Amino acid sequence: MRKPRVTAATSGPDGLAPASDVAAIVAGTHGDPFAVLGVHEVGKGLFARCFVPHAETVTAYTLTGIEAGALSRRDDAGFFEGKLSIKKRQPLRYHAHNAGGDWWLTDPYSFGPVLGPMDDYYIAEGSHLRLFDKLGAHVIEHEGATGVHFAVWAPNAKRVSVVGDFNDWDGRRHTMRDRRDTGIWEVFIPDIGAGRPYKYEIIGPDGVRLPLKADPFAFKSELRPATASVVAVPPAHDWGDEAHRNYWRNADPRREAVSIYEVHAGSWQLHDDGTFLSWDELADRLIPYVVETGFTHIEFMPISEHPYDPSWGYQTTGLYAPSARFGDPDGFARFVDGAHRAGVGVILDWVPAHFPVDAHGLAHFDGTALYEHADPRKGFHPDWNTAIYNFGRREVVSFLVNNALFWAEKYHVDGLRVDAVASMLYLDYSRKAGEWIPNEKGGRENLEAVSFLQKMNKEVYGHHPGVMTIAEESTSWPKVSAPVHEGGLGFGFKWNMGFMHDTLEYFSKEPIFRKHHHNDLTFGLTYAFSENFVLPLSHDEVVHGKGTLLSKMAGDDWQKFATLRAYYGFMWGYPGKKLLFMGQEFAQRREWSEARALDWNLLDFRPHRGVWQTVRDLNYLYRSRPALHGRDCEPEGFSWLIVDDSQNSVFAWVRNAPGGSPVAVISNFTPVPRDNYRVPLPKAGKWREIINTDASEYGGSGMGNGGMVEARAEGKNISATMLLPPLSTIMLELVAD
């Protein structure tokens, strides 16, 4: 607990403030202005003191308009004080005058605190789960006045002020009250409201005035390159998504169809002049497109405020503020509601691993390493030149956990995909020997980060049933998606990076060589059910010179398109939830750049249109067939039919789940049609072809089996003879008797 700061006496025998206090107020260095300014008892009377730069005269009034006394100018810089005629301590308004005119202002120092002892208790304990209702800027009514309550955590600061256009960005005007025990500073500023830009002016423990800081809890920010926070009220949206939310509250997402369309909101589409679409414009275009294409969820790359476009949002300076690039925060609420009404979920890419060191951000926030570790071996990320959150500090953990809860509560998001989890879990991540500090047990595991992730997941799942968390975790850390009470991290799902790597490596090989790499596609099934997996073909695979998914496929142009369609068929038939980055659903040719829109004109060309139709039909099949999604995370839902035909590069398995017919998935990854190919099947009878990625309507050769094959029993074996089209995946569904 912090010791109370010793302050000078508030007045002498005559009621006047000590000269040292006056000088400190005028200089803007006083750490406890509430001990000097405002209304104070002196003897049996009341005195008022205020600092009003540029005023020549000041008269005090009650909020009801009763004159309370003229104040004397103690210092030409604008310090006034005087005895009041009122008998009861209360908030005051001042009428100020100079040669240029007169104006009114309400005294922020005549109001009592807004936060209470219970807030102090839970904040100090790190257990406050509604910090976003207490910290930041909130428009409220307080002691008879309307204004904005500001609160910020800066425990090592000597002085913190709110600055904005309402006080000419003068840090002497609205210095905050230090609550001491918690390190929270607060002030209620009357007569201002939503829409006002502001920052915090902080004097660090060494007495140095820091660069102006944005509010860590700001709900809105200025459009870059401006960096101020903006006073904003919570979304005032009339939500109509109860049916959607009720469905997912009562669902087990592991047994639901989850097909995710990963989107960068700033480049999916743009205006003709290259400017961003607003949230409302995105809602009008993106939501119908996602519905038509059959995806169940949109996953946005980070939309929290960030200063640098090429960071794609992964270097955020405003975790609580939807980026101003796309309009007001209410617009994002309308987008989510519109998506929900259309049956589409919204997942946010969330970045609690690190933050940029921009001067207006969290780095050295109060003049010390506050949100980050002081030791760069734990507090600085060498790959990204960013600061790493101090997960061992309860206030930092509380800041991050509250942010996860904030998006679920205020914006109704359906999930959080947590970025760079591996970098959080390992103290030696991307570090050489001597560049990292072992944990208390001598190991490389970041036990503090583990504890944070477990707490975050427990709170999200505990407070918001129906919201899922997804880990981007690229190592073999065990039990990422196991419950915390079983020793897991508590995520709902984990990205299957091995699937992505192995399959892309396989399909980059010329078909004649694939027989030597057969294990690339079979190995994944040895661990496919060790976690609840999402199969990601994400933005990471189409940037930094990696090309596009189409360009990664081996062969000439026809083979590339055929292989990509077959790959998608393979993936949609493979156990695990699906994720596809925007543009890859129609085989974008150019590598993705955040600076330009997708090449939508490609949909006018048949090969590209065919890939889009393939993805659309796969999505509808995946959603409508329980066998393809009901046991995505359970080994009982998968059985190999053909695992060892490396010579022909053929793979086959069957998917099944309660409530639906079994579906066989058969892939031929050579350009050679395999006629009279015998495939074992689990049941005799007719099997209907429900998709063939080589179909002519997709741009394929049109080879197939006339829509049906028949499996016959020969002794104990059941099989069907069929044609396997070149570079194709087909799915067969057992026809009910």
UniProtKB/Swiss-Prot annotation:
Catalytic activity: Transfers a segment of a (1->4)-alpha-D-glucan chain to a primary hydroxy group in a similar glucan chain
Keyword list, A-Z: Carbohydrate metabolism, Glycogen biosynthesis, Glycogen metabolism, Glycosyltransferase, Transferase
Keyword Coiled coil: no
Transferase in keyword set: yes
UniProt GO molecular function: 1,4-alpha-glucan branching enzyme activity; cation binding; hydrolase activity, hydrolyzing O-glycosyl compounds
Active site (catalytic residues): 419 (nucleophile), 472 (proton donor)
Listed NCBIfam families: branching_enzym, PRK05402.1, PRK12313.1
Family affiliation: Belongs to the glycosyl hydrolase 13 family. GlgB subfamily.
Assembly notes: Monomer.
Protein name: 1,4-alpha-glucan branching enzyme GlgB
